[in-house]
Swiss-Prot record:
It is found in: Secreted. This is Apolipoprotein A-II. It comes from Neomonachus schauinslandi. Keywords: Cleavage on pair of basic residues, HDL, Lipid transport, Oxidation, Phosphoprotein, Pyrrolidone carboxylic acid, Secreted, Signal, Transport. The keyword Signal applies. PANTHER family: APOLIPOPROTEIN A-II.
Length: 100
């Protein structure tokens, strides 16, 4: 019985000591968290710039731009033509009642 009581007492003291040590541990403050965040973002940016310098990525970007331009040019021309036609029809409707 004494052994059981001693074991429970020892367990209670150890758990209280552990909680006390955890409270005394230094918690990271906001300034260090912000500094760590900016350092991580800076490192990521540097890695991204190094990857972007590669000729393979530049070639992919150029090919993507050219493909997009090829697909969008006819659409933009058609939209411009449709807009001109719409505006000319609108202007024709305004001038007809004035001449009658």
């Amino acid at each position: 019985m004494k052994l059981l009581a001693l074991a429970v007492l020892l367990l209670a003291v150890c758990s209280l000591e552990g909680a006390f040590v955890r409270r005394q541990a230094e918690e990271p403050n906001l300034q260090s968290l912000v500094a760590q965040y900016f350092q991580t973002m800076t490192d990521y940016g540097k890695d991204l710039v190094e990857k972007a310098k590669g000729p393979e990525l530049q070639a992919q970007a150029k090919a993507y731009f050219e493909k997009t331009q090829e697909q969008l040019t006819p659409l933009v021309k058609k939209a411009g033509t449709d807009l001109i036609n719409f505006l000319s029809n609108f202007m024709d409707l305004r001038t007809q009642p004035a001449t009658q």
